[in-house]
Amino acid sequence: MNTLQAIVLAVIEGITEFLPVSSTGHMIIASSFFGIAHEDFTKLFTIVIQLGAILSVVVLYFKRFFQTLDFYFKLLVAFIPAVVLGLLLSDFIDGLLENPVTVAVSLLIGGLILLKVDEWFNNPNAAETSQKITYLQALKIGLFQCIAMIPGVSRSGASIVGGMSQKLSRTTAAEFSFFLAVPTMLGATVKKCYDYYKAGFELSHDQVNILIIGNVVAFIVALLAIKTFISFLTKNGFKVFGYYRIIAGIILLLIHFFIHPLTII
C-alpha cells in the first residue's frame, strides 16, 4: 500500500464509519478500483485508522461525552452484547468477512429497511437527548448493534435503527450511536492489534508513517462527516441512504459476478 492508497481508504473510513452505509462495502469497492493488495498490513490499516474516527467523536462531543457516571454505565450496558457475541462468534464472523456477496446482500437489505425506518418509527414524543435513555433502551440498542457483526450491515445503521425503535429521535439515536462507537470500535481495534502482535507481525518505518497519515485523514474527514450527517438528519430522513445502499449493493454484485471476483481487505 502506498501513501495515496492509504489516504483514499482513510477518506472512505472517515465518511462511511458513522453514516448508515457500511464502511466494509466501500472498502471492497475502493480496494478493487485502486488495485490495493490483499495483505496483512492492509487489513491492519483498515482496523487501526478507526482510532482516528473514534477521536473525532470525542473531540466533537467533548463536553457531552464526559457527562454523568450514569451515562457511562448506560454506554457499558449497550456495549456488553457486542463483547459477549463478539467473543462467542469470532470464528463465524471471520468466515462471513471472507464473502463479499454477504456484504452486498446486507447492503441491499439494509437499504430497504432504511427506506421505511422513518415511517415505522415516526414518534412525535421521541426523546431528544441521550440523557433520557433508560438502561433497558441502552441494552436493546446494544443488541441491535450486534446485527452489524454481519459485514455490510453498518454498525451505525443498526444502532441508529435500534435507537429509533426505542422511541429516540433521529438525531438522538445517531448521537448515541456515535458515543457507543467509541468503546465498541476501540475494543475491536485493540483486540485485532493484539492478535497481530501475538502472531509476530512487525511494522516497517514506512508502514508506521502510513498509519499515522491514515489516522489523521480519518479524523479530519470523520469530523466533517458527523457534522454534515447530523445537520442533514435534523431536516431529512434516511431514504437517501436507503437508495444509496441499494445502488452500492447492486454495484458490488455486478462487479463480483460479471467483472472479477472481489476480496475483503
From Swiss-Prot:
Catalytic activity, as annotated: di-trans,octa-cis-undecaprenyl diphosphate + H2O = di-trans,octa-cis-undecaprenyl phosphate + phosphate + H(+)
Listed GO MF terms: undecaprenyl-diphosphatase activity
GO CC entries: plasma membrane
Parts of the chain that traverse the membrane: 18-38, 41-61, 69-89, 95-115, 133-153, 171-191, 210-230, 245-265
Single Gene Ontology BP annotation: peptidoglycan biosynthetic process
Keyword Transferase: no
EC number: 3.6.1.27
Listed Pfam families: BacA
Annotated keywords: Antibiotic resistance, Cell inner membrane, Cell membrane, Cell shape, Cell wall biogenesis/degradation, Hydrolase, Membrane, Peptidoglycan synthesis, Transmembrane, Transmembrane helix
InterPro entries named among the record's database cross-references: UppP
Its membrane topology: Multi-pass membrane protein
Protein location: Cell inner membrane
Entry annotated with the keyword Transmembrane helix: yes
Enzyme class: hydrolase
Miscellaneous: Bacitracin is thought to be involved in the inhibition of peptidoglycan synthesis by sequestering undecaprenyl diphosphate, thereby reducing the pool of lipid carrier available.
Family to which the UniProt record says this protein belongs: Belongs to the UppP family.
Function: Catalyzes the dephosphorylation of undecaprenyl diphosphate (UPP). Confers resistance to bacitracin.
Protein's recorded name: Undecaprenyl-diphosphatase
Organism of origin: Flavobacterium johnsoniae (strain ATCC 17061 / DSM 2064 / JCM 8514 / BCRC 14874 / CCUG 350202 / NBRC 14942 / NCIMB 11054 / UW101) (Cytophaga johnsonae)
Lineage, broadest ranks: Bacteria, Pseudomonadati, Bacteroidota, Flavobacteriia, Flavobacteriales
